């Protein structure tokens, strides 16, 4: 999905479908990452690790298999590309998911001075 928001808006990026194991069971993977990149800038990545979570509290696990991150768009006018992904890190994690969802938003500078 692609949206246009005004710079300075806090945007909630969320997984719209859950992370699932190969057998279809909804699971929390061992490691979940949320990454975004504003055109022309370095990518920013946050990591959530099961069971300790995200030390920055940016990624929130709000239900089994579902996650969200609230990101302030201040100072970031341009096209943002974002991605939710996971990597199996133990034999217990059978998700095998590499990308759960991805998309882009356009952050428009505010016209108010």
Which functions belong to the PLM regions below?
Residues 1-113:
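Polar, enzyme-active/binding microenvironments
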């Amino acid at each position: 999905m692609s949206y246009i928001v005004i710079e300075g808006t806090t945007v909630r990026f969320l997984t719209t479908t859950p992370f699932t194991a190969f057998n279809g069971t909804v699971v929390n993977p061992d490691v979940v990452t949320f990454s975004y990149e504003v055109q022309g800038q370095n990518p920013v990545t946050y990591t959530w690790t099961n069971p300790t979570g995200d030390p920055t509290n940016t990624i929130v696990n709000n239900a089994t298999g579902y996650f969200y991150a609230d990101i302030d768009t201040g100072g970031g006018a341009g096209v943002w590309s974002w991605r939710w992904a996971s990597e199996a890190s133990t034999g217990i994690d059978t998700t095998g998911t590499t990308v759960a969802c991805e998309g882009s938003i356009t952050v428009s500078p505010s016209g108010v001075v």
